[in-house]
Curated annotation (Swiss-Prot):
This is V-type proton ATPase subunit B1. Pfam families: ATP-synt_ab, ATP-synt_ab_N, ATP-synt_VA_C. Its main location: membrane. Belongs to the ATPase alpha/beta chains family. It comes from Arabidopsis thaliana. The modification N-acetylglycine is found at residue 2. One of its GO terms (biological process) is actin filament bundle assembly.
Length: 486
């Protein structure tokens, strides 16, 4: 009998019993008959005829029949020599503070030639449900160093907000930049609190890549190592040539690690998941293999619920210092925001950051289009005591002026520049400078929130005071004057 390397708790099932009752293989699934007492989500060890072993998980139970998804793929599995051992345990992952600075594959095994992890605990990758009354409302801003996000789509600690991208757009570069620069806002007037709860030592990043190619994986590894941010990053890599089924457990292992770092070690964890479109495709593949009734575009009808089991693991808990903030990244097929993956993601998450192809084609980096972007929890993360008292008003005025500038630009294409008023020309000037100076910044150009707000005021001073309708007179008195040192 094969030995089981997972923690086994005693149950009604006879632990370690092996079966040679494989009746069929369908895609990533193995079907077994005559199994005594199989449990949903139970882990099984599969030994092939050549002696190699694989792991799987029970997906469906029907009497004595069990359907098992194999994490390493079903190639080489036959019904004559393959034995399946039921462990009586759900899938658990070892967790430890030592996981920071390490690189793992999609199943949570180290691939950086380092020593094995000495686990401080084994945790169920599905996570434990959080009592809604114990959740704390997300507050305090996570600073990304990117002006369009920090000023106009501020991310609160404990929020979940996705990046909507598409093929060929620089979402990987933006994700790497956020990893390099992300941290809590440093407020000089609260130095004691800053050291205790907001220090860089208390900030960690868990990065999970699903279905990425080798070039992308090397890009992230090299970027983290060269920029010295690797020591606070835990990296999980599921490559495009790894088994598709592994993509279903990769984000869950990453989030289980994040939960341990946040709620047991008191760290503020930023979880970046890329690419959730690959995850959804893996879900569709398993659903098709199980011959389930397909939903929109072949995706399973339960995909909304399944995505929610990942996204809803972000947040803060009463009485715990740590927090989990999620930034999932997904690529929209054919730039279609109505595709099921971005559509359902937008319903669950608290806003979105939209990466725009037109801005990218005009050599503007990062090509974040602020008009379709939104952060629903922004108001709780900004303002006096958290960022600056003018933050909300400046953001509203930038949105208003940029939207008017876009309308004027469209009108100019119809009637020509000669037909525009002097006021319209101001909006056109603002539009150009906003994109070239505010939106555009280097991949290694870090702007703190105060620098970004000052830059925003520089742009708003293009207009006379009477055109800044969204900003109260008191705020204008303090910040509008050109020699203001805010």
């Amino acid at each position: 009998m094969g030995t089981n390397d997972l923690d086994i708790e005693e149950g009604t099932l006879e632990i370690g019993m092996e079966y040679r009752t494989v009746s069929g293989v369908a895609g990533p699934l193995v079907i077994l008959d005559k199994v005594k007492g199989p449990k949903y989500q139970e882990i099984v060890n599969i030994r092939l005829g050549d002696g190699s072993t694989r792991r799987g998980q029970v997906l469906e139970v029907d009497g004595e029949k069990a359907v098992v998804q194999v994490f390493e793929g079903t190639s080489g599995i036959d019904n004559k020599f393959t034995t399946v051992q039921f462990t009586g345990e759900v899938l658990k992952t070892p967790v430890s503070l030592d996981m920071l600075g390490r690189i793992f594959n999609g199943s949570g095994k180290p691939i950086d030639n380092g020593p094995p992890i000495l686990p401080e605990a084994y945790l169920d990758i599905s996570g434990s449900s959080i009592n809604p009354s114990e959740r704390t409302y997300p507050e305090e801003m996570i600073q990304t160093g990117i002006s369009t996000i920090d000023v106009m789509n501020s991310i609160a600690r404990g929020q979940k907000i996705p990046l909507f991208s598409a093929a060929g757009l620089p979402h990987n570069e933006i994700a790497a930049q956020i990893c390099r620069q992300a941290g809590l806002v440093k407020r000089l007037e609260k130095t004691v609190d800053l050291l205790e709860d907001h220090g860089e030592d208390n900030f960690a990043i868990v990065f999970a890549a699903m279905g990425v190619n080798m070039e992308t994986a090397q890009f992230f590894k090299r970027d983290f190592e060269e920029n010295g941010s690797m020591e606070r990053v835990t990296l999980f890599l599921n490559l495009a040539n790894d088994p598709t089924i592994e993509r279903i457990i990769t984000p869950r292992i990453a989030l289980t690690t994040a939960e341990y770092l946040a709620y047991e070690c008191g760290k503020h964890v930023l979880v970046i998941l890329t690419d959730m479109s690959s995850y959804a495709d893996a879900l569709r593949e398993v659903s098709a293999a199980r011959e389930e009734v397909p939903g929109r575009r072949g995706y399973p009808g339960y995909m909304y619920t399944d995505l929610a089991t990942i996204y809803e693991r972000a947040g803060r808990i009463e009485g715990r210092k740590g927090s989990i903030t999620q930034i999932p990244i997904l690529t929209m097929p054919n730039d279609d925001i109505t595709h099921p993956t971005p559509d359902l993601t937008g319903y669950i998450t608290e806003g979105q950051i939209y990466i725009d192809r037109q801005l990218h084609n005009r050599q503007i980096y990062p090509p974040i289009n602020v008009l379709p972007s939104l952060s629903r929890l922004m108001k709780s993360a900004i303002g006096e005591g958290m960022t600056r008292k003018d933050h909300s008003d400046v953001s509203n005025q930038l949105y208003a002026n940029y939207a008017i500038g876009k309308d004027v630009q469209a009108m100019k294409a119809v009637v020509g520049e000669e037909a525009l008023s002097s006021e319209d020309l101001l909006y056109l000037e603002f539009l150009d400078k906003f994109e070239r100076k505010f939106v555009m910044q280097g991949a290694y150009d870090t702007r703190n929130i105060f620098q970004s707000l000052d830059l925003a005021w520089t742009l708003l001073r293009i207009f006379p005071r009477e055109l800044l309708h969204r900003i109260p007179a008191k705020t204008l008195d303090q910040f509008y004057s050109r020699d203001s040192t805010s």
